[in-house]
Amino acid sequence: GTGASGIQIIGDIADKVGALTVFQRRPNWSVPLNNRDITEAEMADIRHRYEEIFAVCAQSNGGFDHLPDQRAYQNVSVEERRALWDALYDAPGFALLLANFRETFLEAEPNRDLSDYVAERIHARVNDPQVAEKLIPRDHGFGMRRMPMETGYFEAYNRNNVRLVSLLDTPIERITNTGLQTSEESFDLDVLVYATGFDVMTGAFDKID
């Protein structure tokens, strides 16, 4: 699978294994987490703005320091929308989800426009257009399902040792003694990784004491 678990695993191990074959049941929308180290000056500024930051979090739906853009989508030019989306895509955290126009998650046309934009960014990051197309969901719009965040996930498919197998095209028929068999090909594998989830919320609490 290529949900939250798969996307994190693939991005992390692609440069550590000799060969990686990704068996994708269906693609998911995903955007960069954009994590980075915080400088001492930035940390000092954050501490100075604690009250402001917590006030924003208190106003937001999810408790994050992002508030939706208050402008009406139809009143904003295509160029201005693009500028906002570029800034949000390159920002850390959940900016593209939580600081966007309200209409992008409530109305079909704005959501389609945003989905097309994110698909364009995926194509820009994946060298092979056919692989990029297989990584783009066509059965739901951006933000319509829980969206995993990623670090270097799409770039992993530019590596010579990474291969994408779309199970929508060639479904798995069975697990074999040496790997697995799809409708078209037999794969010998050293390790079969089941990306079936993890304790995203409670795991850290379970480790206390």
Where are the model-predicted features located?
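Aromatic pocket-lining residues of Rossmann-like dinucleotide-binding sites
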Residues: 9-13
